[in-house]
């Protein structure tokens, strides 16, 4: 059909919402953005309403604006099961100064973009490795303790980031659009219009072998590829492996069993206390995913890129309730994905030459909801399998990646 054939149609808000929910249930698209929530925390309202975000949904910007991102690897801030909050504060301060300097040295070919960037001096400091941090501290992702840890970690970063921006403003001056911002009436000096953002970190988290963004670990052990001969290579999360070795439980056969199940929830050899800590994405009921995102959002200037995972047999109504809960909890956006809802998926937790094994969900609200068979998708560069994280396909062998919008 040509554009001339398009006809106008009247639709109610409820009908549109229902259509969005059904489409998201069908294949994960579209993601949803709550612009009212976005503009409640618009740091520069004098520039007008914010109407759009970047493809991954974590960065809302005015027309022509940009934001330089950086991420702190939280897995490097745990010693003997305790989080080093003072060191986290110091690294945050240094990261803010670095990103502020990046604004000064970055050049853009479009004058409008350069003007917007220099006018607002936005930076987007975020995190990765939160799932690993929880493993290291012995805290389950889908627990009240996990939510509390999220609040504490992000609050420490948020407070240190804003304090540092105020210090830089005293040294070098406020950002040029300061008079149009929410900071002017408060008489608070500020070098940057906004400071914190949680990006997907799909590629860089692979480079540093940590969990991505605020996501739970997707799989503790999974099939990676064939090595010389008929041997199969399995990747195992190093924190999980170390915990098993400390208890004298580690073996290649056990890792193979974990990979086949996709989770430790129903692996008899794993102690119950470890099962509560080492949960993976599909062990976690959707409401816990939403609650975790909301906990971080309360301490983030911009927004958060995160996927709310659903088991294959989740209903349309369950997806609808996730959207409603997200709105009620103050999220700025939400992306959902029902396992097995696309014809081609890009993550496998087991040897693709063998029959798929269903792994049941052990969370209260998701009993008996299994993971669907996941098909392998090849990397176009090296022909190895791709992994799916936060809407991005990633190759662990050559580094190739792409994101679905």
Label every model-predicted segment:
Residues 1-42, 46-48, 63, 71, ...:
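Conserved, charged catalytic cores of large soluble enzymes
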Residues 24-117, 129-133, 210-211, 215-239, ...:
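Function-dense linear segments that define catalytic or interfacial modules
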Residues 58-60, 99-104, 187-188, 196-356:
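Catalytic alpha/beta core of large soluble enzyme barrels
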Residues 91-114, 118, 122, 139-201, ...:
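Internal maturation/activation junctions in enzymes
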Residues 379-382, 395-398:
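Short cysteine-rich clusters marking metal-coordination/redox-active sites
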Residues 385-386, 402:
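Cys/His-rich microdomains that often coordinate metals
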Residues 388-392, 405:
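Short Cys/His-rich "knuckle" micro-motifs
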Residues 398-405:
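Short Cys/His-rich micro-motifs in 6-15 aa windows
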């Amino acid at each position: 059909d040509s554009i001339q054939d398009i006809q106008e149609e009247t639709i109610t808000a409820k009908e549109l919402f229902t259509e969005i929910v059904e489409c998201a249930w069908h294949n994960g698209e579209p993601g949803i953005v709550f612009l009212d929530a976005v503009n409640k925390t618009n740091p520069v309202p004098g520039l007008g309403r914010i109407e759009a975000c970047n493809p991954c949904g974590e960065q809302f910007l005015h027309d022509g604006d940009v934001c330089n991102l950086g991420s702190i690897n939280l897995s490097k801030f745990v010693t003997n099961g305790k989080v080093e909050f003072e060191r986290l504060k110091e690294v945050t301060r240094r990261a803010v100064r670095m990103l502020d300097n990046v604004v000064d040295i970055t050049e853009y070919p479009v004058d409008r973009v350069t003007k917007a960037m220099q006018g607002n001096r936005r930076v987007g400091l975020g995190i990765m490795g939160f799932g690993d941090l929880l493993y290291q501290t012995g805290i389950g992702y889908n627990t009240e303790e996990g939510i509390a840890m999220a609040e504490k970690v992000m609050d420490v970063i948020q407070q240190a980031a804003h304090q540092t921006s105020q210090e830089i403003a005293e040294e070098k001056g406020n950002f040029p659009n300061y008079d149009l911002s929410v900071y002017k009436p408060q008489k608070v000096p500020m070098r940057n219009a906004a400071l914190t953002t949680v990006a997907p970190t799909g590629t860089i988290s692979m480079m540093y072998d940590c969990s991505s963004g605020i996501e739970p670990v997707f799989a503790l052990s999974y099939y990676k590829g064939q090595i010389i001969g008929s041997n199969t290579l399995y990747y195992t999360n190093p924190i999980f492996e170390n915990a098993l070795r400390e208890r004298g439980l580690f073996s290649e056969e056990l890792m193979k069993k974990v990979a086949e199940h996709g989770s430790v929830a129903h692996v008899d050899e794993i102690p119950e206390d470890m099962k509560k800590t080492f949960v993976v994405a599909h062990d976690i009921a959707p409401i816990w995913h939403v609650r975790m995102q909301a906990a971080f959002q309360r301490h983030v200037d911009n927004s958060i890129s995160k996927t709310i995972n659903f088991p294959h047999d989740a209903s349309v109504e369950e997806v609808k309730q996730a959207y409603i809960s997200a709105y009620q909890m103050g999220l700025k956006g939400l992306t959902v994905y029902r396992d097995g809802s696309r014809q081609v998926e890009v993550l496998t937790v087991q040897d693709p030459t063998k029959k798929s094994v269903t792994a049941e969900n052990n969370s209260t609200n998701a009993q008996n909801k299994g993971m669907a068979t996941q098909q392998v998708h090849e990397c176009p560069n090296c022909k190895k399998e791709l992994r799916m994280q936060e809407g991005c396909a990633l190759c662990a062998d050559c580094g190739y990646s792409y994101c679905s919008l």
